[in-house]
Amino acid sequence: MKGLIARFIAGFALLLWAWDMVFPWQQLMQAEENRYNQIQQRKILRVGMVNHPLSYFIGAEGTAGIEYELAKSFANYLDVRLDIKTFDNSEQLFSALKDNKVDIAAAGLLYQPELSKQFQIGSAYYSASWQVVYKKGSNRPYKLSELEGDLIIPAGSAVLPILQRLKEDNPKLSWQTTNQFTQEELLLQVAEGKIPYTVGVSVDISAAQHIRPNIAVGFDLTDEAPVLWYLPNSSYSELQAAVLDFMNHANETGLISRIEEKYFNHLAHFDYVDIQSYLKAIKLVLPKYQSLFEKYCGDLEWQMLAAIAYQESHWDPNATSPTGVRGMMMLTRDTAERMKITDRTSAEQSIRAGSEYLHMLMRQIPETVPKEDRIWYGLAAYNMGLGHLLDVRRLTRQLGGNPDNWLDVKKNLPLLAEKRHYSGLKYGYARGFEAFQYVENIRRYYSSIINHQRVEEQQIQNNEEQPSVPQEISKESDSTLKE
């Protein structure tokens, strides 16, 4: 992220070499069996993870998450099977790594000097920081001394050693830990005013703000640091070298960029008013039309079709634009006639026709485009026309990019409005910058629906099963993590 990935990978390669020079592992544990050889012999790579809405989760289409996709690719790189082992928190995960129960710890873990003394480290694949959050509208803290209450932290959190270190210079700093709530749940409780503050990783906070925009960042608790894998402390470096080689390969082939695009890029834009309006519409308007989205979604998830409709009309079946498009899916008169609908203001007819038209466009996209990216090509065509989509593919090829790579195509969409580019294209000028934003908005709306539903279901369970927050937290200001 922020253009640091390549520099982190190169920098950490140098750091790992220097670390081995200072601490010659071969003198530490001569009798130890080679972990890399163990993986190859058993043909299984054991990776420890923590359930998390960005790193590792089971979604509607199966297992997903940044860490899962990277680990799966690494297992394929080694030609072994991936075995995911899940843990409740980082403390349990690192304990399992010490006890040889997993080969790699992968859970959105930031680099910490203390941990690098206990474990080998892999190379970075993005960067983040720990941040203190508070409820928007309440007094904003700008530094630790301005906190008007305790930080509430999940038990076993990776931030605890950092807090213990900061307490040396800030003796009044105090926090409480809870075994009952995850980091995401604590972020939501801050938004609801149930607790004053918590600490989260910057990318997690960005994701949470799209379902609870009242979450606000007070200040950075740490500088931005690389996110990486941790490996067992070992006298051998083959596994560490394999991870480094794989991450270089993943960077060079665009795998890391594709994962970043899938999970992060749509989070970059945050509009408090827009998100507030959208979340209100999810609660009050979406239930009226959800059954229609489910009925006509076809090969798409119904939440994706709903996100498209919100981008088009804010779920208003009577919406009209100055250009003459109308209805829930904002269809032109020609498209309506083509899709055989008689009333563009009928929510059902509009949703059915819009879905069928999008599916028709997607079927005309070249088969060389990967399955997971076809929806983005289809949406761009839905917005500006199939001809202009084919034009931007040609332009992407002319500029040395890959027309089957959505990242390459997306960045060239705005060029369709520049004369030096569109003058040589078959279909000429197009408002490609609008198509770019159109797709990004839908990605964001889709993600918000998915996460909003997940959080609502989780909170219903919590309200039924769990007592109030004060009964579930314990004072931990003087505690230390178990070694």
From Swiss-Prot:
KW Heme (keyword) present: no
**By its UniProt entry, which Pfam families does this protein fall under?**
SBP_bac_3 (PF00497), SLT (PF01464)
According to the UniProt entry, where is the signal peptide?
1-18
Question: Annotated region LT domain: where?
Answer: 269-483
PANTHER family under this entry?
MEMBRANE-BOUND LYTIC MUREIN TRANSGLYCOSYLASE F
Q: What's the domain remark here? A: The N-terminal domain does not have lytic activity and probably modulates enzymatic activity. The C-terminal domain is the catalytic active domain.
Record-given protein name: Membrane-bound lytic murein transglycosylase F
- Identify the gene encoding this protein: mltF
